[in-house]
């Protein structure tokens, strides 16, 4: 029997006052999502949410990188391809191989044609240089290696891109994405690229860690959501799936949950959400700090400014997420970047 209290929560999420699912976007936002897709489960939900907002985003590609969890870079690539397939877009949205190693390990090899991460990095540069009046949003939700490499290889793209990164516990230490490649973050902080940080802040109500879904919510809302694909797709944990919604349930059932009630943060999805609707968080402009010995060092006189995002509206973001799983509008890249993938 379904819990009345849980049903009330779901109803509230789907009808929360002030949420505008159909927010007007005079032009679609060009975006490349950069992901360590096989690390836990928030990446997969970010990919699906992005791809189901085709009226908001022109998704030019999904690029991948390897972080410490989730196996080799090929496994991150396979998971991203799996989710794109489950969204019915595997013949339209490119999924490109990015960096396995770190920024400092690769930077000196950028003049070589086959450097680590070349497919993703060169594509980012190519799309940043495209003849389009809209600036390209780079949305890294893992380590910053691919983004830093693209900026280092061709600094002329800096005015053409906006980088919105999911990462850091700023002003505190730690955080998974940051720790996977600190030099790439410091490199970006020293450039003039437009740079925004969607904070994580483990255990705090002000970061994306507060944007959480419970297993009960997922089990009740997600089954069957999204387009039905054929043939079915084999999941990371086994099983065959024809919709992303069913795969979402599997991901939640096969991961450790935290808190009371047991839940999991959808960090990466929240970063996509605030690019869609900046009203769902608070933007705080600030002088760019730097990381030294694992600590944030403030530079109050630094003329270089960045934006910090905090105080994410969990109810609005989760309501829009669940709505888009039901009322999806599939994304599409510009015709020149579409391609059939195996």
For the regions a protein language model found, what residue spans apply to each?
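Positively charged n-region of N-terminal signal peptides that target proteins for export
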Residues: 1-5
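Bacterial N-terminal signal peptides
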Residues: 7-17
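N-terminal acidic, glycine/proline-rich low-complexity segments
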Residues: 23-342
